[in-house]
């Protein structure tokens, strides 16, 4: 129980750094999958512009698959950490087992979509036959072989919930390295491997994900000894599943809203294919920065959930304070890098006709990173304190209620020739700032009614 003692006794600022750094690296490497694919695809000799557009269009579905898996993992993470904090290993075993049962169900749905749904989805966003063909090929492979990313996401959260985030990072590094090695081999054709283009990018991605999942499965079996493991614990338990999704469903919806937002933004930008591609490329850079906040959030949530389960008001408040402080520092670094080096990122993707749109998007949307990062931290805090509804409210504001109407209205002025495409990019910083204001109010409320009621701090 050394890991639980660490969660209980180590100073929160040191604990958050110790747990947060591996998680931040893990999330950053997860974003690398998409960036590496786009970088190699953008440098194809033939059809690179169409291929980049295709990857932009398939991205929302990739995000949605990850959303469901990670959201399920987030619920598992918080519930498992809280259960361990309450010293209930029997329930913890059921939580872990039921999460894996849910993974099987999630994969079955992704498989069916990969077989029957990808053509209609891609065709809804473009009429270019080359883009449609490339998009179908790439997305079908990712869906049919999605079990890698699904079970990686679940085992990652099981390891994080017990304080073993280093092992999840090792698995992620292995997957990223496999992906990076295989991308040029399978895309361009090196040695005995034939040139496969965008299909090669898809295969490289899923093989990397499968490698990560297998390694994390081994780590889970070997190191997670706080609770029993076995197929018997995968038997569905309605109470456990409801407990997982009472926390995880808002996280799933939050991630799913990102997919919906990107899909609708693709439709809004459909009048300009170069701007559409530029948005897709920038979104992958933006994810790389925001995934740093997501990684820290994944340290914030189990730490606060654990001490909330133990009833330690001081450590809860420390978790909130340090979580927000570290997030702001990370986002400030992200803003600095993206504002100083937009041309370098454009060169990485060989952006072509999309270059100027991409640079404008980076300079404008990057302003929003500070507020976006704080919003992500707020959501991690809410989830740890059983504040799923508050987390959902922030997600709805950020990805639906404010951003899409605002971008839609701005696009009218752009299509009429009154303003340039850059006007649409301003919808993002405006949205994040307004959402951050609401998030602050919700944080004050949840601290008053969830943390304020705690009186016994003997366990802290």
Where in the sequence are the language-model features?
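Short alpha-helical transmembrane segments in multi-pass integral membrane proteins
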Residues: 1-20, 80-147, 193-249, 304-368, ...
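N-terminal transmembrane alpha-helices
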Residues: 7-39, 43-47, 60-75, 79, ...
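Transmembrane helical elements of multi-pass membrane transporters/channels
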Residues: 18-37, 141, 175, 208-212, ...
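Transmembrane alpha-helix boundary and packing residues in multipass membrane permease domains
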Residues: 23, 27, 39, 78, ...
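Helix-terminus/linker motif at the lipid-water interface of multi-pass membrane proteins
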Residues: 28, 32-53, 122-129, 185-196, ...
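Small-residue hotspots at the loop-to-helix junctions and early N-terminal turns
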Residues: 49-60, 135, 139, 202, ...
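Small-residue-rich hydrophobic transmembrane alpha-helices
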Residues: 52-112, 149-168, 278-336, 340-342, ...
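Short runs within selected transmembrane alpha-helices of multi-pass transporters and secretion channels
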Residues: 73, 142-160, 168-176, 201-216, ...
